[in-house]
From Swiss-Prot:
One cellular component (GO) term of this entry: mitochondrion
Subunit structure: Interacts with IGD1.
Activity control: Activity is inhibited by IGD1.
Subcellular location: Mitochondrion; Cytoplasm
Parts of the chain that traverse the membrane: none
Gene Ontology terms: biological process: glycogen biosynthetic process; glycogen catabolic process
Protein name, UniProt field: Glycogen debranching enzyme
Amino acid sequence: MNRSLLLRLSDTGEPITSCSYGKGVLTLPPIPLPKDAPKDQPLYTVKLLVSAGSPVARDGLVWTNCPPDHNTPFKRDKFYKKIIHSSFHEDDCIDLNVYAPGSYCFYLSFRNDNEKLETTRKYYFVALPMLYINDQFLPLNSIALQSVVSKWLGSDWEPILSKIAAKNYNMVHFTPLQERGESNSPYSIYDQLQFDQEHFKSPEDVKNLVEHIHRDLNMLSLTDIVFNHTANNSPWLVEHPEAGYNHITAPHLISAIELDQELLNFSRNLKSWGYPTELKNIEDLFKIMDGIKVHVLGSLKLWEYYAVNVQTALRDIKAHWNDESNESYSFPENIKDISSDFVKLASFVKDNVTEPNFGTLGERNSNRINVPKFIQLLKLINDGGSDDSESSLATAQNILNEVNLPLYREYDDDVSEILEQLFNRIKYLRLDDGGPKQGPVTVDVPLTEPYFTRFKGKDGTDYALANNGWIWNGNPLVDFASQNSRAYLRREVIVWGDCVKLRYGKSPEDSPYLWERMSKYIEMNAKIFDGFRIDNCHSTPIHVGEYFLDLARKYNPNLYVVAELFSGSETLDCLFVERLGISSLIREAMQAWSEEELSRLVHKHGGRPIGSYKFVPMDDFSYPADINLNEEHCFNDSNDNSIRCVSEIMIPKILTATPPHALFMDCTHDNETPFEKRTVEDTLPNAALVALCSSAIGSVYGYDEIFPHLLNLVTEKRHYDISTPTGSPSIGITKVKATLNSIRTSIGEKAYDIEDSEMHVHHQGQYITFHRMDVKSGKGWYLIARMKFSDNDDPNETLPPVVLNQSTCSLRFSYALERVGDEIPNDDKFIKGIPTKLKELEGFDISYDDSKKISTIKLPNEFPQGSIAIFETQQNGVDESLDHFIRSGALKATSSLTLESINSVLYRSEPEEYDVSAGEGGAYIIPNFGKPVYCGLQGWVSVLRKIVFYNDLAHPLSANLRNGHWALDYTISRLNYYSDEAGINEVQNWLRSRFDRVKKLPSYLVPSYFALIIGILYGCCRLKAIQLMSRNIGKSTLFVQSLSMTSIQMVSRMKSTSILPGENVPSMAAGLPHFSVNYMRCWGRDVFISLRGMLLTTGRFDEAKAHILAFAKTLKHGLIPNLLDAGRNPRYNARDAAWFFLQAVQDYVYIVPDGEKILQEQVTRRFPLDDTYIPVDDPRAFSYSSTLEEIIYEILSRHAKGIKFREANAGPNLDRVMTDKGFNVEIHVDWSTGLIHGGSQYNCGTWMDKMGESEKAGSVGIPGTPRDGAAIEINGLLKSALRFVIELKNKGLFKFSDVETQDGGRIDFTEWNQLLQDNFEKRYYVPEDPSQDADYDVSAKLGVNRRGIYRDLYKSGKPYEDYQLRPNFAIAMTVAPELFVPEHAIKAITIADEVLRGPVGMRTLDPSDYNYRPYYNNGEDSDDFATSKGRNYHQGPEWVWLYGYFLRAFHHFHFKTSPRCQNAAKEKPSSYLYQQLYYRLKGHRKWIFESVWAGLTELTNKDGEVCNDSSPTQAWSSACLLDLFYDLWDAYEDDS
């Protein structure tokens, strides 16, 4: 049974979101275990996916407080470690088993670059509770709660509770049932451990009541928990005043206590001092404020709490000046430099020469200096003198005055705030129309509320304990009674005079009795109730909430926790939710000030929009080749509470952050009623809108009964009226509420997941329409609500006919709430509602147009303000079978695909599609957007990825899919071009059958199902591709698999070209779309640089062999052609292609099983052996055969003898910008060194082959980078080839042993190999020490720009170019590392790492070179010789393919030379080396994931900036990185 959720971690260990739901919490869905599940079955398994090579994987550990088994109790601060086993190329999954609901966390520890252990922050996730009523599971979104205030229930609770049950509420919320304090407020608890004795003699009585509510009324129970305060007359405070904030536990409040006392004194003496005792107007208030300034602030001398008492300090200095101090203090050496700057001295003294807690308010004059230390300072700045004369004291006084200056400013600011707060509060209490207008000032009702509760403790001490309250826009993470706040002094607290704020401290040790008492309180309630409502949660210290909720869950694991949380910040809300494990946050509909705002709230809590995209992991995860597959996996068996995967590929469901779950209240016991805030009539539509939301919902008793006013929890003494029988039509909206709650139950039964329920909200004037849909069945409920926010709203406003597209509907009921009487005069005994009646509305005109598939609803003439109409709807084409049908069958449909046919399904750039379709096909055009870059599924996926993530229903593609079925038809019909390929018909049939179902759906559902179908098929194709490749690919990471998928991108069958002139076979494109068709598709150099990565590492041995043999056919002049053109008109202008060809043959022989057999393969030769150029249809073409062994020898022998020819068909028809001399090709070996030299200043025969072509700049025919001479990479490849043939010769696999030189002599391969070995370092290395130049053939006169490097060229036509730093040396290092002195190599690599390495590519020239031009723009036609027409193609732009060679060299030489880069056994790379490689691939991972081409670009501009003229996906860019991974697999892995 699958109950796993996958959570991806970033390189920093942070969870990665898979969908954008805004601010959110990682929440595990409440899906109950089957009844027969074993006890040790986890509720969930959270699988943490750590990427291979991630920095956090280096010596990485996951630490979690998830208990290791079901028998181990949860302890929040007990962490268990799990080892991260990921390697560089294989991810790791760490399982966190969750056995009970609650809040859990994990963090990671790892070794960082500095060899220090580092830890991440803690990451939290919440497992929601499983609620049951009489063994019936209750989803959280089905909760319908009603609050009751227990003291208003009277002596007989049964009638009210029965009424609540009759209204189909399934949870009752009790305000605190404990004994109340003197104010009689339920939230001012007299004794936390004693229930209200009027109703309950013992906790057992409460338990019996709750059991009755469960058993007989079919409801759950929830009670308030009050952590933050206790009643001001709680008797236990007298014995334990340390439980509050007083002058002993919180000395920083002493000044606030004194201020409060003086305000009370002033209040008592108003009359005797001649101030008004009953404020009539603002002038009276001004008089009062003047009195406060004089009699309160004037007498208090509050500045003594802030400033240093200068006179006292001076007396102490004078008295102790000559004391011999036992302690010597050290001061900064430069202290004398500021001896005359009293401001700087004061700052130093304040920070360094004061007593502890300086600056914190405490007792009067508690801000003091350290006198002995200050005396030493004064003597030091007075040159050590012992004089205690007036001058020293004057200096001290000046310093202390400066110290005091900012302290007095603080005092002034605080006093100003005190006056401001007092003015506003007294004005509210006494004068404001919206305030209580308290009347005369008396002893019982003082001028302003007392901030402190005063009493004599049991120890005889007089105590003043801070009362609790709240602060406007306060930071909930700061305790406003702590020393970090001056809120009590500044009178910023809106105080509750009947509640003493509780002081928990940091842990139970700080207030043992309080923690023990509250623990008993929590335990008692957790054993009885099903849920807690955390009162005033935003003021609850988080560590306190964690402690007590953990304790509560010990006794009730499935405790439902709701919170009153008004932090003012979504981020802070999420913090409380994840730390405390809050199930739902209370949200209030009555806070809406308009219909528009209410519709916004309903939209927020109503569910996802109808037609929302469903997450499907298209290219988000690697697909292990042996992954579990189950074609029935998507079938939802009602008896199996598994967490369903999204397709038959059994990747676990993804855990991603979602907004905190809401308990959306139509009205709370703290809200003004509709009668007060809006109108009576608005009660009904407001309730209906809330009822249909995809959240828990709630109400307060009296809302349904139309109570007129917000009832005061303190002063209200009446009881609920129980005289009217349940269900009577005169009782408000109770009848409708019962029906609405019943509807909610039916909706919520199957809505476990956030994707299961969708809605649409529309606001138009007084009307709000709300459509709630069950995604799986297509059944829905449509509400038309006409609001009445004000009696002044236009009664004649109408709603146009409502049109429901492709849905049928029928009226379920419609009512209007009418007020039939005035507010009932005050009843001394009972709380009664306003007389109303529900009027049933009729006359709706509902029609269905079968031809248009639309339903139309026309409202009756009578649909007054305060009306609702509820309709049942059914979407066309949607039923319980649809979801399973869509998600199934794709595995079977893709089972016959080959890599070639997968290319046709997934890829095909537009030029390729045009080529195959003879110009008929092409990419799909999305209006107002453009074309996807591929015609196949990858084109859709690249567009859909962000659309799905952001649920972008307004995207042009979403609109296009709603407007018609063109994209569906296109996706099927384009595959007709490939119908003869393996498996294509099966894929077409699967698509056709699924799309046929989709075409029957409402148009607004088409985008979602289209994306789902595309995503599922794409995933199955991708999995099939991985299964068809080598085992290493199947074991590897998403990044490696994405690189390997580019192999499929690049190799396909074209009509316009091939690798053979007479046979249409798959050929490798150099890149897409620039090099996709005709003669521009296949390049010898590109093919053989790419062959190892694209074809051999992926296990595509047949394709590799075909390319090798096809190019072997075209060997001419001892060269492999650059442009192949299917062998029709090959061009031989590349000096390096033959060497990359030989390297590819070597790789083939060593990688492919029995690979050496290819050496004896016969190839027919395109040209005669005398190099005569003939057309492809000449009878002599392909008339002679050679073995590949002979081809290899021919390349070596022709180079040894020297090559000199003029290109066939030379002239402008062959190359329009080449000068005449450029067509002359020359190559020779310098037999004094064994190095191959070649080329001229008129051509560019290496991969850096950009020819100048700007007439405006005068660069036509002048190569940007001729690189004539001995190019370093060619000679590295030569060395590799010689080593290869020597090894073959030694094995008896190569019959040749020597070659003829240009002077007629002969040289053995072994001699040539040694000659290169002896001369390479001497000719290429540029020593760091100039004194060694002579040993390395370095001429400083030629302008050595950088040392410690390997030159790019030797003996080029421009001598300074010899010493240029380019990245080509890494190629030589990779293929022939034996040529390099390791210490030199490491230095050169380090320099290149710092100088040449960009985010994704290697800079093609040292940025310090005056020729460096890093921005390539081929369209530029300027007079700039260096850049016009892109002549700087290889003069700074950052090429990606070289990055792979660089990292291969980086790995080889670091592992070889650095112990830090080796494991303990020195057999494998250390985690440090893997981390270094991983870090350097960060840009590539990001690029390939974000690229719409799903590949790596050819090149970038400076620092990885996108180059618009670059081919966006290039074969060698991906291939050379796959080469790196193969190096590691081959060297260090057991299997392949």
